[in-house]
Amino acid sequence: MLAKRIIPCLDTIGKKVVKGTSFINVRVVGDAKELARRYEKEGADEIVLLDITASEEGRSTFVDVVTDVASELFVPLTVGGGIKNIEDVRRLLKAGADKVSINTSAVENPDLINQIASEFGSQCLVVAIDVKRRGKKSWEVYIKGGKVPTGIDFKDWVIEVEKRGAGEILLTSIDADGHLSGYDYELLEYALSYSNLPLIASGGAGSLEDLYKALKIGVDAVLAASIFHFGTYSIPEVKRYLREKGIWVRLD
């Protein structure tokens, strides 16, 4: 049985980690390198590092930040934000990333999914999907840091990215993000019914029960930010709780 993964998310602007609510009203919560090292020591299974304004501002990838963070990190590091082409991916992997996450560029150029999977392997490609609910069992895909609607139905997109060679999906509910009221569990169940890819749940974790419910549904990993950044829970607390509830997680 594969262990379920606990993944802290570091949303960055420059070298600073920030956190907002529904992708807006962000505030600085710390330094990227320091937080990454802290979470690794606490027992994080992976770290996700996202430049949250790169795509919106049309900037290239933050290679210098990745190099700095990766230099003293030994857990897998997934990096995203502003990746436009194969060369961006190559630079990030060379800088120390283990996986790359693409979102806006995947929607604007779906062939990039095929190209990355072919060049580097599906195992290093995460497709991040940000969605807003638009009705019963209906969600729309958003890009540019959750600010631009695409008109693309989530179901259609999740099926397409799997066919094109994505290795994993990072699924974020914009509606739930930062509100600490739980993941969109209906969205997670819906995604699992249409995709066989490993699924990372993101957006809304506020309690230990929230994490448990998502993992119980069948996601492979839970990503969280606020509960770790603001000291609500430590990673060891989370893992002990999940073990007690019968969820298999790695304990150091």
Curated annotation (Swiss-Prot):
**Keyword field:** Amino-acid biosynthesis, Cytoplasm, Histidine biosynthesis, Lyase
For this chain's UniProt record, which GO biological process terms are given? L-histidine biosynthetic process
Entry annotation: catalytic residues: 11, 130
The catalytic activity, as recorded, is: 5-[(5-phospho-1-deoxy-D-ribulos-1-ylimino)methylamino]-1-(5-phospho-beta-D-ribosyl)imidazole-4-carboxamide + L-glutamine = D-erythro-1-(imidazol-4-yl)glycerol 3-phosphate + 5-amino-1-(5-phospho-beta-D-ribosyl)imidazole-4-carboxamide + L-glutamate + H(+)
- In short, the EC number is 4.3.2.10
Q: In which pathway does it act?
A: Amino-acid biosynthesis; L-histidine biosynthesis; L-histidine from 5-phospho-alpha-D-ribose 1-diphosphate: step 5/9
GO MF terms, alphabetically ordered: imidazoleglycerol-phosphate synthase activity; lyase activity
Extract the CDD domains matched here. HisF
Keyword Aminoacyl-tRNA synthetase found:
no
Question: InterPro entries of this UniProt entry?
Answer: Aldolase_TIM (IPR013785), His_biosynth (IPR006062), HisF (IPR004651), IGPS_HisA/HisF (IPR050064), RibuloseP-bd_barrel (IPR011060)
The main location is cytoplasm
Q: Name one GO cellular component term.
A: cytoplasm
Pfam families hit by this protein: His_biosynth
Compartments annotated for it: namely: Cytoplasm
Which PANTHER family would you find in this protein's record? IMIDAZOLE GLYCEROL PHOSPHATE SYNTHASE HISHF, IMIDAZOLE GLYCEROL PHOSPHATE SYNTHASE SUBUNIT HISF/H IGP SYNTHASE SUBUNIT HISF/H
The family this protein is said to belong to: Belongs to the HisA/HisF family.
Protein name per Swiss-Prot or TrEMBL: Imidazole glycerol phosphate synthase subunit HisF
Q: Please name the taxonomic classification of the source.
A: Bacteria, Pseudomonadati, Dictyoglomota, Dictyoglomia, Dictyoglomales
Gene coding for it? hisF
